[in-house]
């Protein structure tokens, strides 16, 4: 090797690989959104949630510490539908221009998803009514698919270079939801899109029967089949999407009105209804006090089942799939135990 060659090598060193792009910094209001963001983003995102799954998601305090955590976010994800009014205050207080309303980094996970209990008119007399419909959309697995799609679109807006990766991971997640809900064999034969459409219009059972496919239904829907048509009582209107998907009935809530604890008169009305309709299960979220539910159980013999509606180590639920598994299993246990009591 001559001197000129050595000089050339010193002037033009071997090209070094470009450093990997830093992951997107993602902040979510709820841990369930953190899980969906990780499903879609994988190693391309770094995600943190602002709330504790043991907290009522309506009433998180928009503390300065939360604003600080959102200050460097590339993407901010919320459910929307006025579930987390505190989220908007956190964003405004963060001073982060990338995640303000209308910016590419602001993701509303509920966008375009049909809601239940959309009020025809509003009045303070009705309690904490949500003007855009019930916001607890994530407890229907089909809605979780659409929420993940909204999150993927948000990531693609901010990071278009990795669009194909986000779309691939979204497709994988949506297929896993279909398999978990309908059973893998039925999804392979019919396709998740067809099954989801039939389930949304309420005609899945009849359609499967007409096609001779009823025996191939699996997943959560098969496991939860014994719950179909069963009445349960809930504390708040948190479970209506779950009940709609799995065919349960909720004739009354323990709350007299949304956000308003029960009066003695309303509590007595709930006791009467539980006895009249043979309700066996009182389903309550982890952040509500047990007093009213325990009283109803004592008066009627119904079982109180306490479940989280968000995920995290503090509530023993690691993923979205675990969340739905837990509610299905706990209800089956309660209804089975109730049946064995009589």
Feature map (PLM): residue ranges:
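Bacterial N-terminal signal peptides
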Residues: 2-14
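Extracytoplasmic metal-acquisition and chelation regions
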Residues: 20-342
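Signal peptide processing junction and immediate N-terminal pro/mature segment
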Residues: 15-19
